[in-house]
Regions:
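Residue-level recognition of a conserved intra-blade site in WD40 beta-propeller repeats
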Residues: 44, 48-49, 93
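WD40/WD-repeat beta-propeller blade N-cap
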Residues: 32-39, 80-88, 126-127
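Structural signature of WD-repeat beta-propeller blades
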Residues: 3, 40-43, 53, 89
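WD40-repeat beta-propellers
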Residues: 14-19, 42, 64-69, 109-114
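Conserved strand-to-loop turn within each blade of WD40 beta-propeller repeats
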Residues: 7-11, 57-61, 102-106
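Beta-strand initiation motifs
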Residues: 22-28, 72-78, 117-123
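Structural hallmark of WD40 beta-propellers
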Residues: 1-6, 49-56, 66, 97-101
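Blade-level signature of beta-propeller repeat domains, shared across WD40, Kelch, NHL, RCC1
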Residues: 94-126
Length: 127
């Protein structure tokens, strides 16, 4: 299994990097674009043996996106989780990978859960 990591930054992009052991270097495998301003945080969800990869990204634009890749080296698909109306600072997955915590500029932490049909619902909030 290849080593990969995800980064974000002030270029409004999320980048997936893959380690090339033969070259002893990291190469950009994919560039994901959906945010209209700085991407503040990214988090890779545990896949628990499933053949799917899931990443959450959040940004200065107030949006959180869920990115999915259903097969190795396949295309990444994005879905907007929510527009928070204020910068979003952090995203963090549960160990099972089906619950996402989001911290935004309204001084609120919201908890979101993915349902069986793939929709995301807010299940909790704390200010």
């Amino acid at each position: 299994d290849a080593k990969r990591l995800v980064t974000c930054g002030c270029d409004n992009l999320v980048k997936i990097w893959r380690r090339d052991e033969t070259q002893n270097a990291w190469g950009c495998e994919a560039t994901l674009s959906a945010h209209a301003d700085w991407v503040r945080d990214v988090a890779w969800s545990e896949n628990l043996g499933l053949p799917m990869n899931t990443i959450a990204s959040c940004g200065q634009d107030g949006k959180v996106f869920i990115w999915t890749q259903s097969e190795p080296r396949g295309p990444w698909q994005s879905r907007q989780l929510h527009d928070f109306g204020a910068p979003v600072w952090r995203v963090s997955w549960s160990t099972m990978g089906n619950i996402l915590a989001v911290s935004d500029g309204n001084n609120t932490v919201t908890i979101w859960k993915e349902s069986v049909d793939g929709t995301w619902n807010q299940i909790s909030a704390a200010a």
